[in-house]
Amino acid sequence: MAEPTALRILVVNGKGGCGKTTIATNLAAAYARLGYSVALTDHDAQASSTHWLEQRAASLPSIHLIAAHQRTGMYTTRAFAQRLPAHIERIIVDTPSAVADRDLDTLLRGIDVILVPLLPSSIDIRAGTRFITQLLAHRAYRAHPVPVGIIANRVRRNTTSHIKLMHFLDCLDVPTVATFHDSALYVRMAEDGAGIFDDAADTNSQREALEWAKLLRWIDDAMAHGSRGQHVGPRPAQPHRSSAESAKA
């Protein structure tokens, strides 16, 4: 039997400030809380994911950091510096604030799922249109197409900007897989290196966690209906359930 490989999820957009790090860190925290062995890869020179993980309490489920933004020393190869522990099951990749076409050659390598956060503003919608077109036409993506999902991020429901964003997303041939609110909750959790799933006692966290469960379910379904091969589940010590089922427990 072939050895299971880690599921690699890329969080990417060509524009900065759309919440890539918030999505990446919360997704890593969610999988860790559900019992997966998780690695968080930080490609951003600002090192926001790295800083988030440095604030994470030892009492919370651990997450392995790969500081891909750091320059390696004279006697250390990049591959060695970014090596993964053998037991890792989920790899979440946080990308730089601006991603050029040439960057996608490296970032798309070995990726299984792509998530594109998008903000509800005219500027972000136009930039998002260009990036998604660029992504789907990129040689690396065409050579190895994988599921792509859009995340409507920092949304205030029933506002004009929200309505415009949803109309735009309805016109795309790419699914909108989650809608996250513009909430101070994310800022507060980030200061402690935590995610939405780490604060089960908070009512606001519980409501937002429902949308995260929707995202996890989409990822599960995308992998189940894809041709990726063996899909790694939670650690054997835990009952076998999908991520979305675990999230609703």
Predicted ranges, named:
Residues 23, 130, 185:
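Residue-level recognition of oxygen-bearing side chains
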Residues 57-60, 136-143, 223-229:
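Alpha-helix termini
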Residues 69, 120-123, 200, 204-207:
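Pocket-edge positions in alpha/beta enzyme catalytic cores
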Residues 9, 34, 39, 96-182:
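Conserved catalytic-core segment of NTP-binding enzymes
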